[in-house]
Amino acid sequence: SIRKLHPKPRIDSINNGADDDGSGSMAVLEIAEAIMAMPVKPKRSTLFIWHTGEEGGLVGSAYFVKNPTVPLDSVVTQLNIDMIGRGRAEDLPGGGDDYVGVVGSFFDSKDLGETVKAVNAKQAKPLTFDYKFDEPIAWANYNNIYGRSDHFNYARAGVPIAFFFTGLHGDYHQRSDEAEFIDYPHYQKITNYIKALTVEVGNGPRPQLNGTKPAKVKPIG
């Protein structure tokens, strides 16, 4: 695998962020274009948002939740995509060809969690879901993934969320987070799945909250 090779030394100090979060940002764009091209659109409108200032403490999503462009109570689900370009075994323990971490879906809404699973089961080759970061006990340390991406502010506002990511690899927040190390077939598979999930949520009943909000979990960014 090309990801086993160390990138050549570079004299600049720029973190290009191919996986974090070029992968998520471009997946949102691809899903938006795919849904726009559908002859029959989902019954619900789909709002595609690129939040800024995530690394500074989820600034952009906090602003949007306070200043939404649509009534916030009309938002039935927030699907967050942050770092979905890696996830192979050489990237992180427990990784694999079909690996993806799923965070928050069952914690916030059993309805949404079941939809996330059901759509995956319909795929030609289902993804392997990792729910280890969906446990509250995992939120107390550095790997507090639930509180470290933009879905968090929506969850605090009472919007059911599901967050997809493929793990914290050795190139995370490093100059070596380059496009040459992205696992493109894996990345495409996850993006196609999230597109299918977006359509399903757009056509299905509104997911009901479990009655839990993560108000006591501090965002990290």
Regions found by a protein language model. Give the residues of each.
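Alpha-helical metal-binding/catalytic segments enriched in His/Glu/Asp
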Residues: 1-58, 194
